[in-house]
């Protein structure tokens, strides 16, 4: 048991060092600024011009979208770029498990997603009448969403060996999630077929958690479903990323 605990500590510290390295190298690279920081704002402004929306709908949608693009943006750059340059091969050759490496990459995306979520939350709270009724639940929702979206980013970029290959599908998937996941349009107003699709997307559950926290209208059953769904998506995306990398590395 003691040996297991020590091994776990070493693996976690190694993953943190990998995340720190990614943060120093990739956080403020051009594509991350464009797709992580600016892209959510551009999409939101393009969709909201000429429309009126309740501020309680703006805050969760904007923050969830920034987390989706931010947490995944860094992995769409870091992993394919390192594979193209051969630095990822050296990392794999080190005495580190692939699971630990992916965990570190996921942490890197998590940190960037949290950073952008906080930035957009502050911006959204400057709107007239903006407030968050349950800050603790909102913070929990941000963290859980960033974990899920970071794991998604690693999963999407895992099969690709270069940035130009990884960016188009990653961007397409995220944009589809934004328009189908309740960021701009309430799920209840969608056709039944699109509602079914929406419930297969992690962003739907992220938006719902943040909306409940924003309004303070918390309903236990949907909240538990949201949390369970995001945890399930995180595990699936993480496991898929490890499996895809193992397959492509061999």
Residue ranges of each PLM-predicted region?
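Hydrophobic alpha-helical transmembrane segments of multi-pass membrane transport proteins
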Residues: 56-127, 172, 178
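Transmembrane helix segments
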Residues: 47-51, 157-204
């Amino acid at each position: 048991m003691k040996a297991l605990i020590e091994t776990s500590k070493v693996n976690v510290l190694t993953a943190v060092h990998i995340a720190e390295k990614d943060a120093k190298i990739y956080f403020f690279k051009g594509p991350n600024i464009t797709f992580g920081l600016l892209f959510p704002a551009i999409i939101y402004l393009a969709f909201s011009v000429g429309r009126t929306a309740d501020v309680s709908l703006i805050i969760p949608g904007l923050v969830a979208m920034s987390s989706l693009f931010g947490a995944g943006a860094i992995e769409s750059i870091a992993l394919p770029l390192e594979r193209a340059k051969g630095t990822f091969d050296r990392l794999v050759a080190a005495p580190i498990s692939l699971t630990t490496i992916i965990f570190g990459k996921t942490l890197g995306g998590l940190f960037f997603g949290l950073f952008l979520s906080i930035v957009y939350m502050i911006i959204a709270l400057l709107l007239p009448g903006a407030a968050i009724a349950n800050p603790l639940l909102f913070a929990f929702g941000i963290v859980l969403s960033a974990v899920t979206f970071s794991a998604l980013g690693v999963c999407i970029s895992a099969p690709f060996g270069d940035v130009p290959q990884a960016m188009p599908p990653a961007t397409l998937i995220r944009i589809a999630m934004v328009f189908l996941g309740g960021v701009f349009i309430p799920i209840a107003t969608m056709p039944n077929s699109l509602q079914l699709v929406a419930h297969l997307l992690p962003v739907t559950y992220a938006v719902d958690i943040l909306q409940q926290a924003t309004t303070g209208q918390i309903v236990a059953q949907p909240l538990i479903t949201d949390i369970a769904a995001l945890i399930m998506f995180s595990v699936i995306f993480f496991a898929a990323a490890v499996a895809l990398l193992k397959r492509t590395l061999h």
